Amino acid sequence: MVKSRHSFFGSFSLNTVRIIGGEWRRRVLRFPDAQGLRPTPDRVRETLFNWLGQDLDGLSCLDLFAGSGALGFEAASRGAAKVVMVEHAPKVAAALEENARLLAAGGRLQIVRADAVKFASSLSATGARFDVLILDPPYKQGWIERLAPLLPQLLANDGALYVEAEYPIETIDACGDWKSVRSGRAGQVFYQLLRRTQHDGA
């Protein structure tokens, strides 16, 4: 098995990111270079999971731009019962699958090779809803605007929407009653947590 692992990760240039909390704390994730792929910095990840609560026990999460897997694996490490990670780039998706295998993640993690909008559209038609939805798309490609009409059908009523973008997001108009309840900035990256208006203060 060790030989197989080295053969897979030895086939392209690798970057690494470390899981910072939970069951897999300090475990290293390996991933290839890809256009638009930017792992969420440790400090930002720590802030996000402080917002969500360190223990995600029993929650379901959907990461539509999984990339390095930093956020999706972190959610699973912190107890999420189900994490669906969507990635379109074949090499990046293959690295996610290999990292999941090395972590012995089992049924908690589902890696999907697909276009984010097409997958979200097909998923919304099934009635599936998630407690946490993560959007960290490549910049300046209009992904958030294209996905916005689908988001209300993918999130539970009391769910949380986490967005990273190159600009601040207070609301997403096509989502209706969603607005930012937490926000921060790290360099040129704006990150925010949005919830339905009627759940503010809950």
Where are these regions (language model features)?
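Class I S-adenosyl-L-methionine-dependent methyltransferase catalytic core
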Residues: 1-202
